[in-house]
Amino acid sequence: MSEIVKSMRQITKENEGIQVYVFMSRAAQQVLRLYGLTKDLENVSNKIFLEIDANRTEPFYYLPGALQVGKFKLFLICPATANTVAKIVNGIADTLITNAAAQAAKANVPIYIYPVDSAEDNLTTTLPDGSKLQLTMRKIDIENARRLSTMENFNVFTNIAVLKEIIDNHP
């Protein structure tokens, strides 16, 4: 998570005038708090919206509609949980992010997505207290990430380093 926020900070410094809107669930808000990243994220985004349901945020913004009418040049889902990826590949649009992804795909808005559970190897993650945790990737999550990469208008990336390139390609 910290690598994503760090990369966003770098991108906003290098791209004067870039508009970054963050849309997140309450669970994402909790994770950011646990890792002490809330202030950092506030510093790199123009506005943060918290999901109320599949169509509404607080403060109010209708993201799916904004994507459909071309208010955004791209839709970046970073990170995407295994649950979000599974819903997208199965056509379930019952959260703000999955609904927005479905609408963006229909409107041919480029979607870039970073599925956190896509590597075939086990993963070591750092917990909020600094300790390490070894995670074993589930085959179903790896398969869903692979399926996502074959879907129209979805561009899957597995390395945070390409975020800058993605933004640079959509001025």
Predicted regions located by residue number:
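A cross-family phosphate/adenosyl-ligand binding-site feature
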Residues: 1-171
